[in-house]
């Protein structure tokens, strides 16, 4: 075993979406960084759908951008269709989504990593961890190299003891075509990490030229929609394409029903729990038997390939059933399968041994991010990578940890949820998880979080000044429009009051009063409209947060002895000792902790402070 001469500040294991974000931000903060991948040709590979964003997820990507991360930038560079979802619904649930070219996404991400000062990229498969007295020292690889590091970030995705299922056939793999990582799971188990299994899946890929698009519904993109916060209109650099919608038929249901016993999921061959909000087609047919059909979305995988992703047909059926099933779908009667669908099981680590910083409680200096923490989705993984990278560097520099709160970000919601809950299914972000989602809109992420990006050294002075200028414009315009009165309809009202009417938009008001309503571009116009139209609701949510902040942010001492607090229920003592929450707010969200327990705990914390 040869030891590499550099002792890195940060070693990142895995170059998926979590690992890339962790490595990039660590290097940008001035650390010496090594990122290890078992295959450099699959850096930032989109293993499942060729898309970024969506409801809740698009909010996270905007937050990553506001903090100085790179997912938004790479998405904009490789996007081949951009949309805003839920445009007819309230502002809290509107979200950007992009169809991306899978190859271009990989190319742009790899290029960014390769050009980052202080960041070294190396091909290698990590087999074990090096630690001394529960402090991380580095990693060893299958290739016989030891790398030393002050901190290590594990972002192993679905590779830890990955097991691929296609009907009654199963074989080890991190994804189809890539080997599984077995050494890491063993290394973590030996060190006392609680590990369980989860499952996810992916649909078949088809040849576009074999599809009859004439019977499908075309779904074009929306103009001017990107992920990076910018002051100028967004013009995508790549040609834009459409997606297409079709649906299953009665024949599809019959094929699945006749072969349900051959599904790896229903045949009892899969022990891991799959994602509730992305079920397989056989799961949908069984659980929603009354539905006559299910929508299928045909999504291009790139502009230089004929392959398309069949969103909605994820399955663990054997290939012969997949073949018949595909050809029962409207427009896919002659479809040619290029890659089979499959399910994959993998190991993940329980959240009770992870701090909200994403540092392990069992080994100092070891951080975990992405699907190893039980999440599903590129966006959730990238956000965790960003947080793990920031906190790894802060640990090396002996600076305070960075933990965004759930009151100010979806990333904060996720961190809090992951470290206060035992997951029974893969964790996916959606807007309903946030208590104050009207404050956490996708359009105002830069206004909420950019000051953190600046302070961390991740956001350039120029970009921060753009965000500050936008914030100033919004505040000044809110005040000016509240003092500008015009006759509108049958009464004289302030323009701010007029904008609060449901049927009035910023654009319609600008058409009526062009001399008074200024045009700041579609993005800033929309933010200004929402800040004014929903001001009453926003103010109430801010007041509620303020009233709860004192107890929410009360810090629980690390050396508190829960077993000695006799007034706590037995379940509360067990759960608090297991999760060791850092604040009263986090403690209150642990399942099984009652309001009475929280009141007792607050008294105990205050007493502890006076001792």
From Swiss-Prot:
<dbReference type="GO" id="GO:0002098">
    <property type="term" value="P:tRNA wobble uridine modification"/>
</dbReference>
<comment type="function">
    <text>NAD-binding protein involved in the addition of a carboxymethylaminomethyl (cmnm) group at the wobble position (U34) of certain tRNAs, forming tRNA-cmnm(5)s(2)U34.</text>
</comment>
<dbReference type="InterPro" id="IPR044920">
    <property type="entry name" value="MnmG_C_subdom_sf"/>
</dbReference>
<dbReference type="Pfam" id="PF13932">
    <property type="entry name" value="SAM_GIDA_C"/>
</dbReference>
<dbReference type="Pfam" id="PF21680">
    <property type="entry name" value="GIDA_C_1st"/>
</dbReference>
<protein>
    <recommendedName>
        <fullName>tRNA uridine 5-carboxymethylaminomethyl modification enzyme MnmG</fullName>
    </recommendedName>
</protein>
<keyword id="KW-0819">tRNA processing</keyword>
<dbReference type="InterPro" id="IPR004416">
    <property type="entry name" value="MnmG"/>
</dbReference>
<keyword id="KW-0520">NAD</keyword>
<dbReference type="InterPro" id="IPR047001">
    <property type="entry name" value="MnmG_C_subdom"/>
</dbReference>
<keyword id="KW-0274">FAD</keyword>
<dbReference type="InterPro" id="IPR020595">
    <property type="entry name" value="MnmG-rel_CS"/>
</dbReference>
<comment type="similarity">
    <text>Belongs to the MnmG family.</text>
</comment>
<comment type="subunit">
    <text>Homodimer. Heterotetramer of two MnmE and two MnmG subunits.</text>
</comment>
<keyword id="KW-0285">Flavoprotein</keyword>
<dbReference type="InterPro" id="IPR049312">
    <property type="entry name" value="GIDA_C_N"/>
</dbReference>
<dbReference type="InterPro" id="IPR002218">
    <property type="entry name" value="MnmG-rel"/>
</dbReference>
<dbReference type="GO" id="GO:0005829">
    <property type="term" value="C:cytosol"/>
</dbReference>
<feature type="binding site">
    <location>
        <begin position="274"/>
        <end position="288"/>
    </location>
    <ligand>
        <name>NAD(+)</name>
    </ligand>
</feature>
<dbReference type="InterPro" id="IPR026904">
    <property type="entry name" value="MnmG_C"/>
</dbReference>
<dbReference type="GO" id="GO:0050660">
    <property type="term" value="F:flavin adenine dinucleotide binding"/>
</dbReference>
<dbReference type="InterPro" id="IPR040131">
    <property type="entry name" value="MnmG_N"/>
</dbReference>
<feature type="binding site">
    <location>
        <begin position="14"/>
        <end position="19"/>
    </location>
    <ligand>
        <name>FAD</name>
    </ligand>
</feature>
<dbReference type="Pfam" id="PF01134">
    <property type="entry name" value="GIDA"/>
</dbReference>
<dbReference type="InterPro" id="IPR036188">
    <property type="entry name" value="FAD/NAD-bd_sf"/>
</dbReference>
<keyword id="KW-0963">Cytoplasm</keyword>
<dbReference type="GO" id="GO:0030488">
    <property type="term" value="P:tRNA methylation"/>
</dbReference>
């Amino acid at each position: 075993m040869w030891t590499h001469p550099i002792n890195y500040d940060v070693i990142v294991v895995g170059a998926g979406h979590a690992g890339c974000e962790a490595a990039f931000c660590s290097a940008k903060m001035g650390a010496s960084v090594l990122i290890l991948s078992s295959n450099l040709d699959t850096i930032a590979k989109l293993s499942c759908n060729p898309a970024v964003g969506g409801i809740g997820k698009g909010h996270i990507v905007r937050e990553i951008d506001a903090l100085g991360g790179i997912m938004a930038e790479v998405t904009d560079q490789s996007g081949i269709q951009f949309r805003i979802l839920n445009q007819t619904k309230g502002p809290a649930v509107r979200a950007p989504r992009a169809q991306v070219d899978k190859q271009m996404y990989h190319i742009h991400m790899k290029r960014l990593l390769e050009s980052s000062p202080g960041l070294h990229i190396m091909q290698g498969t990590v087999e074990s961890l090096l630690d001394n007295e529960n402090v991380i020292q580095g990693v060893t690889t299958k290739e016989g190299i030891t790398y030393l590091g002050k901190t290590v970030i594990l972002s192993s995705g679905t590779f830890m003891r990955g097991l691929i299922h296609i009907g009654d056939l199963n074989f080890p793999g991190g994804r189809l075509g890539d080997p599984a990582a077995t050494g890491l799971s063993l290394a973590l188990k030996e060190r006392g990490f609680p590990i369980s299994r989860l499952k996810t899946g992916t649909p078949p890929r088809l040849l576009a030229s074999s599809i009859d698009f004439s019977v499908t519904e075309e779904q074009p993109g929306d103009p001017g929609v990107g992920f990076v916060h910018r002051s100028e209109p967004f013009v995508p650099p790549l040609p834009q394409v459409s997606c297409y919608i079709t649906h299953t038929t009665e024949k599809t249901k019959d094929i699945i029903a006749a072969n349900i016993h051959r599904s790896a999921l229903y045949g009892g061959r899969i022990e891991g729990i799959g994602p509730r909000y992305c079920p397989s087609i056989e799961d949908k047919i069984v659980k929603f038997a009354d539905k006559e059909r299910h929508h299928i979305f045909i999504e291009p995988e790139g502009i230089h390939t004929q392959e398309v992703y069949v969103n909605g047909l994820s399955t663990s059926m054997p290939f012969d059933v997949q073949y018949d099933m595909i050809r029962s779908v409207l427009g896919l009667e002659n479809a040619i399968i290029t890659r089979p669908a499959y399910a994959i099981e993998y190991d993940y680590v329980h959240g009770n041994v992870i701090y909200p910083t994403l540092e392990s409680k069992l080994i100092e200096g070891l951080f975990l991010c992405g699907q190893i923490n039980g999440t599903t989705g590129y966006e959730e993984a990238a956000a965790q990578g960003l947080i793990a990278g920031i906190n790894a560097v802060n640990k090396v520099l002996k600076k305070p940890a960075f933990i965004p709160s759930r009151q100010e970000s979806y990333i904060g919601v996720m961190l809090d949820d992951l470290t206060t809950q035992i997951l029974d299914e893969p964790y996916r972000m959606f807007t309903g998880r946030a208590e104050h989602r009207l404050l956490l809109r996708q359009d105002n992420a830069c206004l909420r979080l950019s000051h953190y990006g600046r302070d961390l050294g991740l956001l350039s002075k120029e970009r921060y000044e753009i965000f500050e200028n936008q914030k100033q414009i919004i505040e000044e315009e809110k005040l000016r429009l509240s003092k500008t009165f015009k006759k509108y309809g049958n009464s004289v009202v302030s323009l701010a009051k007029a904008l609060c009417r449901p049927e009035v938009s910023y654009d319609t008001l600008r058409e009526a009063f062009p001399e008074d309503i200024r045009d700041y571009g579609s993005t800033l116009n929309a933010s200004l409209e929402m800040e004014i139209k929903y001001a009453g609701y926003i103010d109430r949510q801010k007041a509620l947060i303020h009233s709860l902040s004192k107890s929410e942010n009360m810090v629980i001492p690390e050396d508190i002895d829960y077993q000695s607090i006799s007034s706590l229920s037995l379940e509360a003592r067990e759960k608090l000792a297991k999760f060791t929450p850092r604040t009263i707010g986090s403690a209150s969200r642990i399942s099984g902790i009652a309001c009475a327990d929280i009141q007792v705990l607050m008294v105990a914390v205050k007493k502890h402070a006076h001792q």
